[in-house]
Regions:
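Beta/alpha (TIM)-barrel catalytic core signal, keyed to glycine-rich beta->alpha loops juxtaposed to Asp/Glu
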Residues: 1-162
């Protein structure tokens, strides 16, 4: 497609894929990222917080009122993602950062541009702090290991499969 478009003086500017610590096929997505880098195409990550699952503190089981869909998502993914979220919490505690910042820095570490849905002022203020620090290689590797060993990932198309 890239060469076809070049022949027509057109180009792909961005590619948007599901990319988070809970995405399936992250190795495939990393291959797509490499192709994007080679062709100067921005790689955008949708659902980098995995519908908020990656923001759920592993030590808190009741997180208040949620919609029917959110309740289903959290009930389905809370236990299988506990170890991953514990690793995220360890990093967030060491960095005095939120779990959301850890998840987004995992994206940034790889040169990925996350698309984040923010609904509340406190979320906006929190995400602004993501630019004040970077993951170390060790922290990145800890997250990668925990992500790979996570037994339940999001479906390939979470918008039609949840």
């Amino acid at each position: 497609i890239i060469n076809f478009l070049k022949d027509k003086n057109k180009r792909v500017s961005t590619v948007q894929v599901q990319f988070s610590l809970l995405s399936p096929n992250n190795e495939k997505q990393k291959h797509v990222k490499k192709i994007c880098d080679q062709n100067k195409i921005d790689f955008l990550a949708y659902s980098p917080l995995a519908f908020g699952i990656l923001c759920q503190d592993p030590s808190i089981t009741d997180t208040g009122k949620r919609s029917l869909l959110r309740n289903f998502i959290f009930q389905t993914y809370s236990k299988p993602t506990l170890e991953l979220r514990n690793v995220m919490k360890e990093i967030s505690n060491a960095r005095s950062a939120s779990l959301a910042q850890v998840a987004l820095n995992w994206c940034f570490y790889q040169g990925v541009i996350p698309i984040v849905g923010l609904r509340k002022k406190k979320q906006v203020l929190d995400i602004c702090n993501v630019f004040k620090w970077d993951l170390t290689q060790r922290e990145f590797e800890m997250l990668e290991t925990a992500s790979k060993s996570c037994v339940k990932k999001l479906p390939d198309n979470p918008f039609s499969s949840l």
